[in-house]
């Protein structure tokens, strides 16, 4: 119904079909001469969940940055390997992350912000938050 990165990677939906993303902020960036380019986002396993099927290429995807991959998660941060041919976003940039498994993300939050055209239009309380027993 909402779509997620697993469905996207399987080709069952397009990025435009994804109805739920996580707003994340770039909190660090690294552009090494050795070629390692990455950013760190302020969203980790406590918001994205840690599900990663063996066939998945990361722990989530980024809207508008199809070649970027979330390579690692800690509780509060996501490390994103950034493509060589794209400029690294500055610290403070807000990015939209598609979680691998949208069910986990909605189970991990108290409410969902409903945004249309960058404007907050509603907030939905997650009535079943944490009720997976």
UniProtKB/Swiss-Prot annotation:
Biological process (GO) annotations held by this record are: D-serine catabolic process
Q: Which residues cross the membrane?
A: none
One example of the protein's molecular function in GO is: D-serine ammonia-lyase activity
The superkingdom listed in its UniProt entry is: Bacteria
Query: Entry's Pfam families?
Result: D-ser_dehydrat (PF14031)
Question: What Gene3D superfamilies does the annotation carry?
Answer: D-serine dehydratase-like domain
InterPro entries the record matches:
D-amino_acid_metab_enzyme, D-ser_dehydrat-like_dom, D-ser_dehydrat-like_sf
Q: Which PANTHER family match?
A: D-SERINE DEHYDRATASE, ZGC:162816-RELATED
- The name this protein goes by in its record: Uncharacterized protein Mb1449
Q: What is the lineage of its organism?
A: Bacteria, Bacillati, Actinomycetota, Actinomycetes, Mycobacteriales
